[in-house]
């Protein structure tokens, strides 16, 4: 081989640690970046340096941005009485893409998990209780994943906040375009329990 590829190999190895990329996909991505150095690699490296220097968690809700308090928390047009609780930032961003929620968010940073040793103090649950009181929240919407840990977390939060605020959760069941034959028993069961009048 004409020259050392140590740095390129290290980049491939690092890229392979990203979600959704294995060693083969990482190698293809790195080779593509190198081929498109001026168009992709150089601007990407510059932006990654900027993000590494400025990215931080919002001190209020846990969103990711470039200031101590994120744009959502400082947006005065947002409904201040509604707080949507999500597991992580990716869930917050998914809710924002839908455009249906106009309130504020609270990112837990995960779910309770006895197997993984994650308790309430490892998450932002105590901060959630503080926000409900300090911000005069009237409704907490639990938008947690329909997993065992997600449901355990939802029940724990309901126990902690019960009686202090209206608690709701996202409906669960048959997705738009979904066919019953392809759904698991738990999804069909949840859909039956959440049925509504037409």
Swiss-Prot record:
ZnF start-end (C4-type): 58-73
One annotated GO molecular function: DNA binding
Keywords: DNA damage, DNA recombination, DNA repair, Metal-binding, Zinc, Zinc-finger
SUPFAM superfamilies from the UniProt entry: Recombination protein RecR
Domain Toprim positions: 81-175
Gene Ontology biological-process annotations: DNA recombination; DNA repair
InterPro entries: DNA_Rcmb_RecR, Rcmb_RecR, Rcmb_RecR_Znf, TOPRIM_dom, TOPRIM_RecR
Family under the similarity heading: Belongs to the RecR family.
PANTHER family given in the database record: RECOMBINATION PROTEIN RECR (PTHR30446:SF0)
Function of the protein: May play a role in DNA repair. It seems to be involved in an RecBC-independent recombinational process of DNA repair. It may act with RecF and RecO.
Stated name of the protein: Recombination protein RecR
Organism: Ruegeria pomeroyi (strain ATCC 700808 / DSM 15171 / DSS-3) (Silicibacter pomeroyi)
Gene field: recR
